[in-house]
Amino acid sequence: MAVIKMTDLDLAGKRVFIRSDLNVPVKDGKVTSDARIRASLPTIEDSLKQGARVMVTSHLGRPTEGEYNAEFSLQPVVDYLENKLSAPVRLAKDYLDGVDVAEGELVVLENVRFNKGEKKDDEALAKKYAALCDVFVMDAFGTAHRAQASTHGVGKFAAVACAGPLLFNELEALGKALDNPARPMVAIVGGSKVSTKLTVLDSLSKIADQLIVGGGIANTFVAAQGHNVGKSLYEADLISEAKRLLESSDIPVPTDVRVATEFSETATATLKSTSEIQDSEQILDLGDVSVARLAEILKNAKTILWNGPVGVFEFANFRKGTEVVARAIADSEAFSIAGGGDTLAAIDLFGIADQISYISTGGGAFLEFVEGKKLPAVVMLEERAKQ
């Protein structure tokens, strides 16, 4: 991957515009999971140490584009950064016509999605971003799959466009897992979005020795085996696709599950065979036999790619499956990569971050990279490196 690396540049006195992924969950004005900010911090700190005039921005949530909405403000991120850096951090709301930043100062530019044209990669907006800086640093792997004004367009017009350490390390780690993995390689694909992940399963079936499915995806495979899945989250129109994958790949479909009659934190979990599910029930977690089987598979793996929980781990009664899988990955000697927002939340919950070889900040970008798709931001950086 031929790109200009931020670590190869002298940033002293330069106006540096860093596009980070600071899209974190916020509740009552406080950041509730800081994994993405923590991952972005080394890039920010390195720029500050060099005496750069540092501007950092990100999107947060899904506000109506072009309209300010306090609910989606980056203020909670600013508060977090001030605390972590033990230094004042400014939040700039109106910055498109210029912002003054001192050497060694950090200014956070308000949510890029408050700017009209951000999502459409509007050229005029991209040029305004580019005019703010001497060096554009793309460090948001989590949004590298989106061609937007702050992730793609700005890089075309900035004097210098480079890859930040986080982005570069993400691409290297994923390359290591996908290009020449130590075997056996096990890929776990869970979560609720089935249709978006079936193409990923297809791609992974060609490189992984063993596929594992969980969550809503697993429910579709249970249905494909002819079982009633009741009110479970699944996609009926993808059953034939699931059958095709079952014929071509070794996928351990759950044989027992935890079900409930309502989707709530207080719902009672009932352990059942997949052949016994009633119309009124929904699958919210894997059963003990199914989970033990997965733990055994993971124990023998040499490379593990993990995207998505295997149950509704947010509810204590339906957490066991994801916890057993998470701890099996943590205890494994395999090179492990985990990615996706829900996966990061599970890693935080079980306190196993130090036992995962590499934690990717990307969700959609992680999946598109796994599928072998070209990420627009990376293509842009490669193009700029040739100029």
From Swiss-Prot:
This is Phosphoglycerate kinase. Its EC number is 2.7.2.3. It comes from Sodalis glossinidius (strain morsitans). GO terms for cellular component: cytosol. Substrate binds at D21, L22, N23, R36, H59, L60, G61, R62, R113, R146. The gene is pgk. It catalyses: (2R)-3-phosphoglycerate + ATP = (2R)-3-phospho-glyceroyl phosphate + ADP. One of its GO terms (molecular function) is phosphoglycerate kinase activity. It comes from the Bacteria. It is found in: Cytoplasm. ATP binds at K197, E314, G340, G341, D342, T343. Belongs to the phosphoglycerate kinase family. Its main location: cytoplasm. Keywords: ATP-binding, Cytoplasm, Glycolysis, Kinase, Nucleotide-binding, Transferase. One of its GO terms (biological process) is gluconeogenesis. Pathway: Carbohydrate degradation; glycolysis; pyruvate from D-glyceraldehyde 3-phosphate: step 2/5. Monomer.
